Amino acid sequence: MKIEKIVAREILDSRGNPTVEVDVVLESGIMGRASVPSGASTGEHEALELRDGDKQRYGGKGVQKAVDNVNKIIAPKLIGMSSLNQRGIDYAMLALDGTKTKSNLGANAILGVSLAVAKAAASYLDLPLYRYIGGTNTYVMPVPMMNIINGGSHSDAPIAFQEFMIRPVGAPSFREGLRMGAEVFHALKKVLKDRGLSTAVGDEGGFAPNLEGTEDALNSIIAAIKAAGYEPGKDVMIGMDCASSEFYHDGIYDYTKFEGAKGKKRTAEEQIDYLEELINKFPIDSIEDGMSENDWEGWKKLTERIGDRCQLVGDDLFVTNVDFLAMGIEKGCANSILIKVNQIGSLTETLNAIEMAHRHGYTTVTSHRSGETEDATIADIAVATNSGQIKTGSLSRSDRMAKYNQLLRIEEELGDLAVYGYKRIK
C-alpha cells in the first residue's frame, strides 16, 4: 500500500483550458488517477490555483508550474508513505506548501495528488471510492440541483443571477430524479425554441438564451416543468445561484453590470426584499450566494428573514473553508454550505468542512466547477458524506453526465439501502 510513484501532467478541461492530472502508483502496481476542476466565478478567499502566466502558451493559463511542483517537490516527499494515511499525506503537503492559500505549490497541484491517493487506496482495498471515504454508513443518494438556465458570468444573457436550477425533490430515487430532470431539460429546450430563443448550451450544459430577465427565466422553467408533466413546488423545486459578489460594489448590488439600463441598483436591504419577493412568488427553496461574500451583515439579515423557509447556501462566503464556516455559524449567516474540493485544495480539508457543517445543522451541497473533466470523484464524495445534494450541471455535456452516470452506478450498488436525499434534509 506504499506509494511508489507520483506523476502529474497537463491535460485540458471542458473549456479547453489546461488543468492538472495526477497518477499515484502503489508498490503493488495499483494506480489512482485524478484530475482537477477550475471555476469561472471564484471567491476571493479561495485556495490559489497556480497558473503559469506565460502569454505565449495557452494565453497564460498553462499549469506546467503546478505539474512540476507535483513531480519535483511533492512526489519525493510522499514516496514511501502509506496510501491509507490520507490525513497524514494531506497535512504533509500543506506543511510543504506553508501558506494559508496554497500559493507556493498551488491548490491544483495538492488537490490532484490528494484525490489520486484516495483513489489508489480505495483500489488497493478493493472498495468503491464512496465506501472508502465514507465508511459503512454511506447510504444517502443526493438530490441533483440541475443548472438548466445560465446567466451572469456563465452566459451572455442580460440576467445578473448566474444559475437557475431544478431540484426534483418529489422523486422516489436518484434514478427517477435524474429522469425527471432530463425530461424538464428537454421540455425547456422546446419552450425556448418555440419563442425563437437560442438553445446553445453554456459551460455547465444549461441554456443561455436572451431572456427578458430573472422572472422570465423562472417562468420559462415553470412552463417546462408543467410541459414535462410535473407539478412545480411539489415534484420539482427551483434553486438559484445569485453569485451576487459578482455585481456587488461599495455596498450596492448593481444589476446594471449584467442587465444594462434595465438593471436596478439595490442596497442590502432592498436585495433581501427582492429575494423574499421571489421566494413568495415562485417555488424556490434554495438560494446560493444571495448576498456578497463581504456583506456579512446582509447575510445575517437574509438568514433571519427567510432562513426558516429557504436553504441559503454559502459558496463565495465560505469557500469550503472551516475558518469562514465557523465565522458564519457564529454570526448566524446562511444555513448551508457549497462544497467544492478545489476551493480548499485537499480531500481532508473538504471532509473537515462537511463534518463541521453537519455538526452545526447546516446542509451541504457537493459541487462541480464550470471547468470540469471526465473525473467523477465528486459523485463519490457526495454519497460518502451523506451530503444529500449535488450540483453538477445540466443534462448535457459528457463532463457533467460523468457524475450523474457514476451516481446511477452507486445507487444500483447500494440497492435497497439507498435513501434519496431530500427525505433526510427536509
UniProtKB/Swiss-Prot annotation:
Q: What is its main location?
A: cytoplasm
Localisation per UniProt entry: Cytoplasm; Secreted; Cell surface
- What EC number(s) has UniProt assigned to this enzyme? 4.2.1.11
The answer to keyword Acetylation applying to this record is no
Give GO cellular component annotations, separated by semicolons.
cell surface; extracellular region; phosphopyruvate hydratase complex
Catalytic reaction list: (2R)-2-phosphoglycerate = phosphoenolpyruvate + H2O
Q: Where is the active site?
A: 204 (proton donor), 340 (proton acceptor)
Q: Which InterPro entries match?
A: Enolase (IPR000941), Enolase-like_C_sf (IPR036849), Enolase-like_N (IPR029017), Enolase_C (IPR020810), Enolase_CS (IPR020809), Enolase_N (IPR020811)
Q: In which pathway does it act?
A: Carbohydrate degradation; glycolysis; pyruvate from D-glyceraldehyde 3-phosphate: step 4/5
Family indicated by similarity: Belongs to the enolase family.
The record's annotation in NCBIfam families points to: eno (TIGR01060)
Give the protein name, as stated in the record: Enolase
This protein's gene is called eno
